[in-house]
Amino acid sequence: MATSDSQSQQGTTVPDREVAKHVFAAELNEATYTFKTSQDERAPVYVALPTGVRANRVCVMGTVTDVEDVGTDDQEYLRVRVVDPTGTFWVYAGQYQHEALKKLKKIQPPEFLAVIGKPRTYKTDDGTINVSLVPEDIGVVDISTRDIWVFEAARRTLERVESARETSPKVAALAREQYGHDGSYFAHVAAFALQNLLDGDESATELDAETIEERLEEAEAKGDDVDGEEPEQETLIED
C-alpha cells in the first residue's frame, strides 16, 4: 500500500498513480471543494485539503464500527464506517471495487482497517456536501499499525500546516478562499489525536511515550504560533 506524502503539488503533469496523503477524518470531511488542473476529461479530480495541499488519493486507518449493504436486491453496495481519533470516514464499495468489496464483506467490527482510496464528494437532499472514500486497496491491521498511522498522520498534518503556503501556494490560497481559514486549526486536531494515543489504555504502539510527547509538544506549539499571512491567489478549474 502506497503511503508516502512526498510529492510536488505544483505543475500540471500528473503521474498515473499519485502518492496517498495521510489525512485525519476531521480534515478530510471538511475537504468538500474539488478541482482539476486540466480541461482533459480524464484528468484526475482533486480535493483541496484545508491544510493547503491537493489530494487525489489518501491513506487512512481506523476502527470499523459498522458495515451495511445499502445497495439493491440484485447489486451489493457496502457502506463502511471507519473511526479515527478525530472523526468518521465513510467508505463505499460496489461492483466496480470488486476486490475491496470482497474484503469488506469479511470485516468483523471492531477490526482496524487501512484504506487507500480516492476522496469523492456528494450532495445530500438538503444541499450538504459530504466526503466519502472509494477504496482502491484495503487491509485489516493490528493496533500497533493503527497507532503508528496516527503518529504519522499527525506528523504529515503538521508539515502541511507549517509549509503548505510555501510548497503549494496556489492550492493553499484556494483552500483558504473556499473554507474561510488557513488550516492552522488542524495543528490542534493533530495534538488531540496524539493525546488520544498517549491516553489510550489499549495502545500497543511500538512508539515510546517520549517520542509521542515530543510530537505533541510540536503540535501544540504550531497550533499557538501560526503565521496569518495571506497566501497567493490562483484560479483552478472547478470539477
In which residue ranges do the predicted regions lie?
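A general secondary-structure signal for short beta-strands and their flanking turns/coil
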Residues: A55-R57, Q75-Y77, F112, T128
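Extended, charge-rich, solvent-exposed interface segments
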Residues: H98-E99, K106-F112, K118, T124-E217, ...
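Short, surface-exposed secondary-structure boundary micro-motifs
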Residues: T63, K118-P119
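OB/S1-fold single-stranded nucleic-acid-binding modules
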Residues: M1-P50, R54, F192-D239
